[in-house]
Structure formats: C-alpha cells, structure tokens
Amino acid sequence: MQKTTPITAYKSTCLSGKIKIPGDKSISHRSLILGGLANGETHIHGLLESDDVLNTAAAMQAMGACIIKKADRWIIRGTGNGCLLAAEKPLNFGNAGTGARLVMGMVGPYHMKTTFIGDASLSKRPMGRILNPLRLMGVEIEATHGDRLPLTLYGPKMANPIRYRIPIASAQVKSAILLAGLNTAGTTTVIEPILTRDHTEKMLKAFGAELEIKTDAEGTRFIHLNGQPHLTGQTIHIPGDPSSAAFPIIAALLVENSDITIENVLINKSRMGLIETLWEMDAKIELLNQHKTGGENVADLRVKSSMLKGVTVPKERAPSMIDEYPALAVAAAFAEGKTVMLGIDELRVKESDRLSALAQGLKINHVDCEEGKDFLIVHGKSSAKGLGGGHVTTHLDHRIAMSFLIFGLVSEKPVTIDDKRMIATSFPEFIPFIQQLGGKIS
C-alpha cells in the first residue's frame, strides 16, 4: 500500500500573476469517448492529463481505439460507431466516476461482456442511476450489493430505445443514456426537468449525431437522439475547467491584497453557479476577453481580494455548481454572516460523503457550521483570527484536499491535509500553480 503524503498550507498574502487552468474534465472525458467511437481522426488540444481522464483513455484503447499523444495534442483513430471490441480485461477507472458512468452507457448496448472496477472510493459510489435505464434497454447486469463496483454488463443482441425521465438532476445519467442510444436502433429520448451541463449534447451534434432538443413551457428539456448515426472525427480545443478554477478564484478573493488572472476558463451557462453566487457575495470577479471556442463560451477571469458577505444559495442552483460547493464553503467561512447551501444531498455520493467531510473539516478548523441531510449552514466571519490549526481527513477526495489547502492560505493557523496524492485525479498542477501565485504550501 502506498504511503500517504500529508501537506500543509500557511497564511499567505498578495497572490498575483496569470495562470492557465488545465482543460475541462467533463469535456476531456467526452472528447476521448466520442473520438474513440468516431470514424477517422480526432485531434484534441488542451486535454486534461489527470488520472481520471487517462483512465478513460485507457478504457477506449482497450476497446479498439488508437490514442497517441503528439507534442501538445492527442490524436485518436476511432473504431467507428457500433464497432467497439470487447475488452480482454476489466476496465479499471481508478477514482473516475464520470469516466466509469459514461463508458457504462456507451458499452451497455453492445452484445458483449464488459467488467468495470475502480479504487476503494469509486467502489463505494452508487451506480444504480446509470444501471436502471440500461436494464430497460435490455442490458443484463451483475453488480456488487447496492449496484456498486465491481460490476459486469452483458449487452443484449439488440438494445431497446427508451424514453426516460431523469429522476435526479444528473448530467452523467443524461449523457450515459445518450451514449447508449448511439448503438441502439430507433429514437432514444431523455427528459430532463432541470438543466444540467450540456457538453454531451453539443459534442454529439458536432460529431454528426442526429439530435433534437425541445423545451416546454416549464423548462423541461426533451432530448431526442436517432440511433446508429455515422460519427466523424473532429478537432477539439478544450477550455479551462471552471471546477478547477474555483480554487484559485477563492484563494484570490480571500487572501489579502491579491489580484490574479485565470486565462481561458469555460463559462458555459450550465457551469456558472459558483461565479453567480460569488457575485451575490460581493466578489470582485471580471470576465475579460470573452469569446467562443468549439461552441463553448470562454473568458479570462480577473479576481481581486474582496470582503464577502453570507448569502443563501437556492437548491435550484445546485446542478450548475455541484462540484464547487467545497470551495464555496471555504469562502463562506471567511464571509461576514451566514451562508446557507440548500439541496446539496448529491454531495453525499461523491468521491466521499463530501457534505460530511466538509462539515468535519470546517469544525476541526474552528468554523461554526451546521450539517443537515441536504444542506450546510456556515456562520462566517471576515476575520481569520482563531481559525485553522486543523489536520483534515480528506477521505480520498481531491476537492476536499484542495479546499482545505486554500483554507490554510487564509486562516490564522496553518492547515494540514492527510494526503495530497488524490489531487492528481483532477488537477495535477494545483500545488505548483498556487505556489506560483504566491501561496505558501509545503
């Protein structure tokens, strides 16, 4: 067993400079999957080279896609839609929940056996939300108790197209069903009552899938996919990941006399919940150099130290910022007044019980907070006096690790996390980037 690697963050001042955040994790996974399915070559610029994404690349290679890195781009020669090969060994996704769930959807309708395994954290996460629609399509499944990994899919001779209303706001469920529809004759329909990140829909259209999206008067989206399309390789430029940008954003807002610019960040409207919330808290964040890259809105973010105030974050906003709540909780600890985060029960089934881990980390660093089944209330104060000094258990969760290192840059006393290794699952450059801006982490 590998040894844990603790690391400590110390009170810092005057963060400054420019950084370019690594490519968006959601788009990186989808680029590899669709590139691996398409005919011809797909060229990817700005791929996030994190452990999670590379595990998805390995899975696509195991099923017949040719993937190589050449200079600063990745080149994929796909198998052609409907032509994946059966993997000879179980597909190991490590910590990658997104990769595992999307690939389950993609391979489910193939008439072959595919086994999925992962690390201890991923093996605790529920997969039923993906497996239930696959069962309706005719996929037979052998899973560990509670629909968890390890699990094996046995695809049908001919999958059934389904019309499926998503019971929870989940881009992963929506995307898995649409990817399953690619190798299913007929029309697959996903009904989405609450908008979630829409990268899959945009990218499917770009690769040549026949996709129709209608929205009713209540805002419910009906996404219709005609099965078995011809997919053609594309050139993709991946913008910076807003979920990773959250950490330097919060650091610059909280560390006194800071002024940083984060270049080339994705500002898709379905991913803007954190920035909208921070603006409500009086954060000084400017969107500069706004433009489009590959159909996505992108901007540079200029962030300056700000005196934040507590706010109530409505539950309706949760899908657009579900991965950013750990960073927001740190901001809330140093904001004047009470911050209430509602409708965040989805955090309980992330890489850890993220809601519980957040509350534990805040309390051990002397922040007054209340944890409920689906909410977190943080009683913040603009003074850092008396805060920090804790040793945080990260529970193998990269976002808990990064959040409390940011906390330590602001608090009076240093903050230590029990292990930094899992940060590599989403943001391998995190520590050197923060150090480059002037943050004290060692």
From Swiss-Prot:
MF terms in GO: 3-phosphoshikimate 1-carboxyvinyltransferase activity
Presence of keyword Disulfide bond: no
CDD domains, per database record: EPSP_synthase
Enzyme Commission (EC) number: 2.5.1.19
UniProt entry keywords in alphabetical sequence: Amino-acid biosynthesis, Aromatic amino acid biosynthesis, Cytoplasm, Transferase
GO BP annotations listed: amino acid biosynthetic process; aromatic amino acid family biosynthetic process; chorismate biosynthetic process
Protein name: 3-phosphoshikimate 1-carboxyvinyltransferase
Name of encoding gene: aroA
